[in-house]
Design a protein with these regions (language model features):
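Start-of-helix register in tetratricopeptide repeats
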Residues: 22-23, 56, 90-93
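Canonical positions in the second alpha-helix
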Residues: 47, 81-84, 118
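Short coil turns that delineate tetratricopeptide repeat
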Residues: 52, 86-89, 123
């Protein structure tokens, strides 16, 4: 009986810790919506450090950095988002934004490649 009770307690503790909620990401999203890109960037970085396997924080981090006219820095955040992305829709968004970064840098060859990759992940995009 003691072993069963111990097993149940251990299982519950793992389930609770595995479902830790990211409280920083919604705050960062609010700041981004309010055009507080520096604050949003900081909170996206915190969110990504707490949950490094998730895609949303590095993708949104790239967007916040891009809005601050730091395209070169945004590339690194988008690259990190690509590492964790499994969804074709999300990969499309990341590649599209990478294409925008390369266009801003006047790196047209890489921009075309990024846009092609975006279309490969979502062929119906116009």
């Amino acid at each position: 009986m003691k072993k069963v009770l111990l097993y149940i307690l251990i299982t519950i503790s793992f389930a609770v810790s595995a479902q830790e909620k990211d409280k920083t990401l919604p705050k960062a999203n609010e700041e981004y919506a309010e055009k507080k890109f520096v604050d949003a960037e900081a909170n996206y970085r915190i969110s990504h450090s707490k949950f490094p396997k998730r895609t949303v924080a590095p993708f949104n981090l790239g967007n916040a950095i891009y809005k601050q006219n730091q395209a070169g820095e945004a590339k690194f955040a988008y690259a990190k988002a690509l590492e964790n992305t499994k969804s074709r829709v999300q990969r499309h968004k990341v590649f599209h934004n990478l294409g925008n970064v390369f266009m801003q840098e006047k790196n047209y060859t890489n921009a075309v490649d990024a846009y092609k990759n975006a279309l490969r992940n979502k062929p119906t995009d116009e």
